[in-house]
Structure formats: structure tokens, C-alpha cells
Amino acid sequence: MRMSVGLSLLLPLWGRTFLLLLCVAVAQSHWPSEPSEAVRDWENQLEASMHSVLSDLHEALPTVVGIPDGTAVVGRSFRVTIPTDLIGSSGEVIKVSTAGKEVLPSWLHWDPQSHTLEGLPLDTDKGVHYISVSAAQLDANGSHIPQTSSVFSIEVYPEDHSEPQSVRAASPDLGEAAASACAAEEPVTVLTVILDADLTKMTPKQRIDLLHRMQSFSEVELHNMKLVPVVNNRLFDMSAFMAGPGNAKKVVENGALLSWKLGCSLNQNSVPDIRGVEAPAREGTMSAQLGYPVVGWHIANKKPPLPKRIRRQIHATPTPVTAIGPPTTAIQEPPSRIVPTPTSPAIAPPTETMAPPVRDPVPGKPTVTTRTRGAIIQTPTLGPIQPTRVSDAGTVVSGQIRATVTIPGYVEPTAVATPPTTTTKKPRVSTPKPATPSTDSSATTTRRPTKKPRTPRPVPRVTTKAPITRLETASPPTRIRTTTSGVPRGGEPNQRPELKNHIDRVDAWVGTYFEVKIPSDTFYDKEDTTTDKLKLTLKLREQQLVGEKSWVQFNSNSQLMYGLPDSSHVGKHEYFMHATDKGGLSAVDAFEIHVHKRPQGDKAPARFKAKFVGDPAPVVNDIHKKIALVKKLAFAFGDRNCSTVTLQNITRGSIVVEWTNNTLPLEPCPKEQITGLSRRIAEDNGQPRPAFTNALEPDFKATSIAITGSGSCRHLQFIPVAPPGIPSSVTPPTEVPDRDPEKSSEDDVYLHTVIPAVVVAAILLIAGIIAMICYRKKRKGKLTLEDQATFIKKGVPIIFADELDDSKPPPSSSMPLILQEEKAPLPPPEYPSQSVPETTPLNQDTVGEYTPLRDEDPNAPPYQPPPPFTAPMEGKGSRPKNMTPYRSPPPYVPP
């Protein structure tokens, strides 16, 4: 009876305890598959003993907000304002850092006063950066209690990103950016200021402050400026058509190029007023404003970046294969981004992926395979969620998958769906990669180290495969695992390296040293990875290696191509870069080297000439010695950039070397700068200074130096210095010291050979023309020999018998010769003896009306001729009295 009473008292107590434990077990078993809103449902159903635990969990659940993703371009300023109303903060401490880390990327700066995130990325910062923004409440014990959190991404594009797109991304006024954009393939005129600064040593705030100071100085908008470091010591642009010096006498740091756009296709005549840059840069005003020395400035036309040439190679068409897996459970996609909590798995919605289009088969409705491995143990998840990106042509995959960060340059994985299988994507390669990874309890896409990956079903006629995919998981942040997609590396045959980015074209100038570092993303090999892990070889056509005496050389260890062309190499040259992996397979990239004429031509303001001891033949025939000479000459002037020296000529007379300095402006004559350079390397009498001698020894020993003006300074002589009594303007530009009679140059050849020959030829031509004119004038009016033969005899003409008319006797000279058709003369006029009043004097106006002949009067007397003259008329045109009568020649009687 007592036991029955005790049992009746214990039954209600055990019943309530058993019911409570049963509810907790059911809640734990259903928690992983329910959405996060189940917290509020279970809060109303559980007992008061668990209410405090769920209350703490509800307070720790962050509020997900949407901060839009951003884009940045290498060398251009980036700025984004974090909206505090989206975070929901009211007096909390806002913390901004890289997702999963405690600090920001090296190129970003957070300003807590203005709530702005700004920076300037460099070439090493390309890729996607995930930024976490969280607000924390300060506790009484000094610790920070998280209140809200959000994650957004910033994708950094390379420097040669599309200019209009980059301008639109950075410019607040889209209409202004569109109006200022140049036409397609139209060169953009850019003004560049060279600073003696190192961007890699600057903090993000110092870079932005430098741009702000230049903005206030030049009144150029911040989004139009570009700030990049100097690459390969190329401080100056050889294609610049205008340039000027700065106040820096010596370059110490690596150098920075600060540039902005002036217009489209401008030249020296149409460029806008640049006096606001030219004078301040030379006088030091710009340097004082910016806080860094100014080396110089130049203006050049930049051609817009053209899209890379796409190889039209037909790849093997993949065959989709349906993989049969275990039963799957389709989980509905939640409408919002869910941040993992200490007791719930993370479910990340897909976002947009910037990936190139592919030709892979698009799978149907994919589902995620979920495998249950016993009881699920809840472990706290550290670090915020990181969003993933899915291409526009891809599919939306649902499931308990944690977002991953894809390393830039590698292929981004996709969640596996069955059926059918998905494909792993890589740029410009159509390759199916079936695989079936499963999601474990930590909800990541990485496999456990002890799990053997599943071998996919072989796919026929597939000759290209995707490169290895590296993934950095976000949970836990202190341990990063790498995984590969597809078949394990040990079971695959060696793959041929692939060409990813073409070298395309290299520009070089006559007499100017150039060097090109082969980018690491030019080739890619599945086993050996990037280009710097491959063996590169430079070859000509038909697998012919570049010789030791070629003007182009290649260092396979440093993967550096360099050279020094001369005037005989002007034009286009084709070369082939071979990349070979450790297995012996290789890939080839064909590119061209365009050699242009000297950038300054004959307009250089000064010519430097030095005489060295030795024979010039070994220097002329050895490209390595010529390059060493150019480098030593640049070092003697204090320039680390060897492209500032343009080699003009190497002639006999020991070793006579001529060169110009590309840093000198063409107009007006930079007399002060040339004088400074002259005093740096030589004395006034032409002897080299010790600094110049030490810079070139022991390979080259200088004996004398001469510096003469040319171009805008053609009337000046710098070294040796002209005597004070003779003005420097009377010195001809070709005059050189007479210490060495064997010295010669192009000017001497023209002066002593070409010009005299042309003058003599012109004089001879003019003399010949004058002689011909005089001869023709003297011969004018003279008969030819044939005409002279006709009138050579002045005798009586010969008349033949048949030509003589015997019917009429020859006329006699005593009687007048009257023709047969003649008539008798008219009778003489009648002269009345008395004066008639009607008669009009002959001197009157009517003299023309007097008619002496009266043919109409029949009674008129005959004409009476006037009496002959008694005295001969001696006057002009009178005949002689006695005239010899005409005698006919005797008739011709033939023999």
C-alpha cells in the first residue's frame, strides 16, 4: 500500500520529466532542416527552463542588411559610404574588416567620422574582396557585443579595363562621362606627371590624400585621375609629343605616374593650355603642393585597349552524362541571405558571378545531395557569411552550402546536382567535369581529408580539361583547406600547357634599350600552374632559337625579354614564345615586335659624344656590350631608367659613341639643363670627370667628351666651352674639337661630301644651259648647207630651148613695152582760160569732189601728155639714164 502510494506520487514527476526530455530531443532532431524562423516558434512552446537560453540566442542573431556590391579599377580612387541606417546602429561601434579577418585589405581605408570606405588599388590587389560591416554595443566590462552584421564584395578590375565603363563606375554624372568618352579606336590624349614616390610604401590614406592635393592643384575631378606605379623603370613614354622637366634632380624611389585625360587625338597645336603644369613642375610649386618631388611630365596619345584575340579553335564537344547518386532531398531556397548562428547551419543564396560565357551543357532542375551521418552535433561557426557568385547563364542551386571565396585566376566551383551532373567552368574552355561532392555537417563544399573522392564516369572525346580549382573555405577562418575538382592528379596524364593571354605586340625604338617581363598569366598548366613555373624559350620561325648576336635576347630564368635595336631593324618582326612544362609538353604564343624610328629624330636639343679606348668592332657586334654601355651611360647621368639614353652611332677613332638624352624637352632650348648635364660628366676642356669615368670603368675608359647643340640649340657649343671672346652663336653645329682628325659623323658627311657635290652639279648644269642658249642664238638666221648649195653661183640662169617662146620677138629697149590688153589713155582734161566763179580752189574742202576725167563728155579733146622733163630729176628713186637692155640667153642646142 505504501509502495503504491509512492509510485503514484512518482509517476506524475517522471511523466513531466520524460515529456520535457522528449520535447528537447524532437527540437534538436528537427532543428537542422527547419528555417531560422523556428527560433520564434520554439520560444513560445518550450518550458521556462530553456527560455533563457533561447533568449540569448535570439539576441545574438544578427540582422542581415543589403549593402550593394562595388567595383574598383586599378589606379583609380574608390569610395563608398556605409549607410548607418541600413545597419540600424544607434551609438554602437561600427567595425569594418575583411570577412573572416580582423583587418581591411592593404589598399582600403575606413574613416569612422564620415563612415566612408575609400582606397586606391594596385595591380597586386586585383580580384574579389569581401568586406564585413558589423555594429557592436560596448558592454559594461569593456567587451563588444555584436548587434548587426553585413557582408558585401568589391571586385577590382585591371588597369586596362574598359575606359568608358570605368568612368561610368566612378563618375557620378553618367551624361558627362558619356560626352567625354572618345570614339572607338580613337587615341586618348593623356597628361602624365612623374613623381619620385613609391606607392607600395604609402598607406591607403596617403594615396587618397595625394589625389586630393592634385585635385585642388589642377582642378581635375578625382574620378578622372589615375595613379599607378612605374613598371620596369619606364619613367618616360617614348611616344610622347610634348614633355617637360620637374624640380627633381635625382630619382630615389621607384616612381609613380599620375595622369588624367586631356582630350581625344590631340597634337602639339591643339593641346589645351598647360602652363599651369609646365612652370609649376619646373619651379617646384607643384612639388611643394603634392609633397613629393616631380621628375617631369609628358603628353602622349594612348590607343584604347583592344580586346584580346580569341583563338578560333574547335574544342571537343562534351557529352552530358547523367550520374546516378543516392536519394536526394530538395530543400527550398530561403528568400533572404541567412547568416550562420552557433546552432544553425548556414544557407547561402546564390548571387551574380562575373564569369565568361561557356559552352557547357546547362543542367536541368538541380538538387543537392544530402547525406546524414549519424547524429548532428551543433558546433559554433566562426566568421561571417561570404556571398557566392553564379554566372547569368548558370543555374540556381539550392541546398545547405556555405559560400566560398574563389582565388582570382582560378575556376569557381559549382554545387553538384543530380541528375544531371553540373560542369566546372573555366574561362574560354568548354570542358565537362562531372563530380559528386557531398555536404558534411559543417555545410562546406570542401571534402574531408580522409574521404576518397569519387571517380567520375569517363566522358568520350574530351581533349581539354579544366585547371585545378582552389577554394578557401570560410568556416573555420583559422584553417584553410584546398581541394581539387574532378579526377585526382595522380590518376591523370600530363596535360599540355594552355595559352591564356597573348603577348600580342611589343613596341621598341631605334637606339633605345627595352625590356619586357612576361606576365605570369600568359600560360597556364594544370600540373605546373602559372607561367613562372614553366620553362620559356624565345624562338624564330621553324623552331630556330634566337642567337647570341641577335638584337633581341631572352633570359629564361627571370623570364625577361630585352633588346637594343638599330636603324636596320626598323619594321615588324615576328617571334614565338614556347612554354614547356616538366613533362615536356609545350604551348606557343606568336607575337610581334614593332621597331620605330628614333622618338626625337634629329630634333634632340643636344648630342653627346665620348671617345673611349679600344676597338669599336667588339662593341658594335656584341649586343650585350652595347646594352652594358647604354646602362652605364644612364647610370653616369643618375638615371635608373635606361630608356632615357638613345644610342645614335658608334664609329672608329678608338671608340666614338654618340647618344642623346630623351629627358630633355625639344622646345624651347633647355640650355640650363644641358649645361647641368655637361658639368656632371665633363670638365670645360672636354676631359671626363671622375664620376663619369668611375661609372663606365672597367669595361669602358673615356678619354674625351664633346657636347654640341642641335635642334633648338643648334647654335650652341657646350663642351668644350667656347672662348669668351667668340660668341657661342657663331659656332656651327657640326664643329667638333680638332683633337682627332678621324672623327666623323653624319653631319660631317653631309657637309664635306654631299653638299659640295650638289653645288658643283648645279653649277655645271647652269653653265650648260647658258652655253646652249648662246649657241642657239648665234645659229639663228643662217642657212643650212643644202640651202647654201642652191645659191652658191650667181650667174645667168639657163633657159632651155623648149622653154623659149620664139613667136614674139624680144622687146626692144627703145620702145615702151605695152601689153596687149592695154587701151589708149584718156584725153587730157580741159583747162579753161578764163576764171570761172564756180571754180573752187584746190585748197578748199571740195578738192575731193573735183573730177579731172570726163569720160562722159564726147566732145572732150584727146589727152595731151605733158612735155618731158628737160633736166633729169635727181631725187629719191630716180632711174639711171643709160640702162643695159635685157639680153636673152642663147638658145640651148643639145649636142
Curated annotation (Swiss-Prot):
GO cellular component terms attached to this protein's record: basement membrane; cell-cell junction; contractile ring; cytoplasm; cytoskeleton; dystroglycan complex; dystrophin-associated glycoprotein complex; external side of plasma membrane
Extracellular side: 654-749
GO molecular function, one term: structural constituent of muscle
Signal peptide boundaries: 1-29
Residue ranges of the motif PPXY motif: 889-892
Phosphothreonine sites (modified residues): 790
PTM note: Autolytic cleavage produces the alpha and beta subunits. In cutaneous cells, as well as in certain pathological conditions, shedding of beta-dystroglycan can occur releasing a peptide of about 30 kDa.
Stretches for region Mucin-like domain: 316-485
Annotated disulfide bonds: 182-264, 669-713
Keywords: Cell membrane, Cytoplasm, Cytoskeleton, Disulfide bond, Glycoprotein, Membrane, Nucleus, Phosphoprotein, Postsynaptic cell membrane, Secreted, Signal, Synapse, Transmembrane, Transmembrane helix
Organism domain of life: Eukaryota
Annotated site location: Cleavage: 653-654, 715-716
Compositionally biased spans, kind Basic and acidic residues: 736-747
Region (Disordered): 348-369, 413-499, 724-747, 823-895
Residue ranges constituting the Peptidase S72 domain according to the UniProt record: 603-712
Transmembrane segments: 750-775
Tissue: Detected in brain, cardiac muscle and skeletal muscle (at protein level). Expressed in lung, brain, liver, kidney, diaphragm and stomach.
GO biological process, one term: nerve maturation
Biased composition, class Pro residues, residue ranges: 859-870
Keyword Transferase: no
Function recorded in the entry: The dystroglycan complex is involved in a number of processes including laminin and basement membrane assembly, sarcolemmal stability, cell survival, peripheral nerve myelination, nodal structure, cell migration, and epithelial polarization.
Name of the molecule in the record: Dystroglycan 1
Source organism (scientific name): Oryctolagus cuniculus
